[in-house]
Amino acid sequence: MKNKVQLITYADRLGDGTIKSMTDILRTRFDGVYDGVHILPFFTPFDGADAGFDPIDHTKVDERLGSWDDVAELSKTHNIMVDAIVNHMSWESKQFQDVLAKGEESEYYPMFLTMSSVFPNGATEEDLAGIYRPRPGLPFTHYKFAGKTRLVWVSFTPQQVDIDTDSDKGWEYLMSIFDQMAASHVSYIRLDAVGYGAKEAGTSCFMTPKTFKLISRLREEGVKRGLEILIEVHSYYKKQVEIASKVDRVYDFALPPLLLHALSTGHVEPVAHWTDIRPNNAVTVLDTHDGIGVIDIGSDQLDRSLKGLVPDEDVDNLVNTIHANTHGESQAATGAAASNLDLYQVNSTYYSALGCNDQHYIAARAVQFFLPGVPQVYYVGALAGKNDMELLRKTNNGRDINRHYYSTAEIDENLKRPVVKALNALAKFRNELDAFDGTFSYTTDDDTSISFTWRGETSQATLTFEPKRGLGVDNTTPVAMLEWEDSAGDHRSDDLIANPPVVA
């Protein structure tokens, strides 16, 4: 994976809502800013029950968005990442509809999981209570197979039916996705919800040894096709470290809440500790199409005796701080307040979660860009977007608070804002300075500040992050300072917004 900043976006939420329009915006408005792009699901349909993450046909581009030819055209200028939704597919898919009609006589019957296929001898209360699920309740819903009511496994929503990845039909389906991606000039595949993709009686059915075998198998198939694999798993931080040794790339989901914690408390020790132990083969993010995963810095959800990167009371306080910073907007979009019950996420844009404080926001981005890994910026974050309460009220889907539709005119207007200009400059700096391909080190000054340094053959750069200097959402004091050396000499910026860095 190229060591350059990437964008995460939906195909339909930048410009006129097509892949061609998105491509034009990337090539013009963000030229030199984003080298690669993760296009969130654009399959048929892209606007289903979970915004494309419940595909009816995972191998077809929704014709309302464009075609595979449009994807291939984009690949001429940008490396492309695409999702492979490993755990489930839409109940409206031809395969599941065939099972509904024919029951066990359907050729696709083995492809889908029922309670009895995982628990052929029945399940005890302990078995069922031990299943980990990111939603309340048990992971089953009623469907009729040829008139007979069955309990179908659904890890997420009733419309997203789980695939039996052990079955021949299930595996053939997943490989058909890999084949299509390889044929369409895709460079990277993100394995969505893979942590739930291997079911086994008597286990939590989440990130078990069987899951790691599935991940290894998928990775092998990716290598055969020239596809680099990225794993998407929200879990206890030690599991993230363990996963990283088994895959090409893993998300650093602990970073977003850790930086929110540092900026609200002034304490950098948790960030320093994470810097010391985190995997370097990471994709770093502050925001994604999902909420902010506070679970990733707390204690293990399956064993509370395993402590997190911060105490659980700090996690609770952080959630309350985000709600306060957003004036209750995130609270209206999180948990039982909205239709999608996310037990481990707070729904808000990252900019709003910081109380729309420009200095805090650019400092968080700077730390993200300085930590080892490939940085990705979500399209709403790329424009320092605020919570979309109008869309939330329209859909009552909590995550939609962070899924705004930007017209081209709106994009152009936001590009004039100083904080967005500063972010674009910072991304270009990250892409152009060769020090970021060199060696990394960090130092701390007690619990007050942390400095990150990169040294290359012809350049070097040091970012100092000192959140205590600007505590409070209304405090406009800069909390990040940057020093760098390039071919033109030594440079320094004490305010990344007023004086953004430029590589000579």
UniProtKB/Swiss-Prot annotation:
Positions annotated to bind sucrose: 88, 190-192, 232, 289-290, 342-345, 399
Family annotation (CDD domains): AmyAc_Sucrose_phosphorylase (cd11355)
Enzyme class: transferase
GO MF term (any one): sucrose phosphorylase activity
Residues binding substrate: 50
Catalytic activity: sucrose + phosphate = D-fructose + alpha-D-glucose 1-phosphate
Pfam family, one: Suc_Porlyase_C
Signal sequence, start to end: none
pH dependency: Optimum pH is 6.0-6.5 for the phosphorolysis of sucrose.
Quaternary state and interactors: Homodimer.
Role summary: Catalyzes the reversible phosphorolysis of sucrose into alpha-D-glucose 1-phosphate (Glc1P) and D-fructose. Is involved in sucrose degradation. Also displays transglucosylation activity in vitro, by transferring the glucosyl moiety of Glc1P to a broad range of monomeric sugars, such as D- and L-arabinose, D- and L-arabitol, and xylitol.
Protein's recorded name: Sucrose phosphorylase
